[in-house]
Amino acid sequence: RRLVEEAHIPPYASHYIGAGGVVLSESDELLVVRERFGFGGRAPMMKLPGGALQAGENLAEAVVREVLEETGVETRFESLVCFRHWHGYRYGKSDIYFVCRLRPVSTTITMQTEEIQECLWMPVEEFLGNDAISEFSKWIVRAGLENRGMVPATVGGFPDTREREFFVATDTSDGLASFRGRRGS
């Protein structure tokens, strides 16, 4: 097979794709990590567990895998709550970072020591009130707690969910009370 003259091929990889998980325990503690290495010359800060998607990996699978790899905590995907698009990331490429709400299936931490310096369950109010935590991290945690987000959906004509992922907005937004209430379901 040969490409035709009009074929559109990107000249190079243009984006990094990553995902982080907002994981809230039954006792209103947020699963957080501190990486071993800072970014942009800054000291490592507490943040959500997460990382890069692997080639061919779906978003929902990737965030569950990343949280498990970094923390040892098993989770189940609930929803996509927000994302950030940032230009000028590594090597001048753009970065898309998805924030997902996950439900913990286990709570025992087994920290991955190659990349992670510290991992713990932190009271959510302590996280939000901590001056040493970035405003971005606080903002995305609030987004994860205050809206129900978008849930996976099957779209007619696209039955293979391994090939394509679709997320649709839920019809209500009742915040933290709803998030806490759904844990048992």
Identify the meaning behind each predicted range.
Residues E6-L48, T75, S79:
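N-terminal strand-loop-strand
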Residues F37-F39, L53-A55, C82-H87:
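Short, catalytically relevant binding-site loops at active-site mouths
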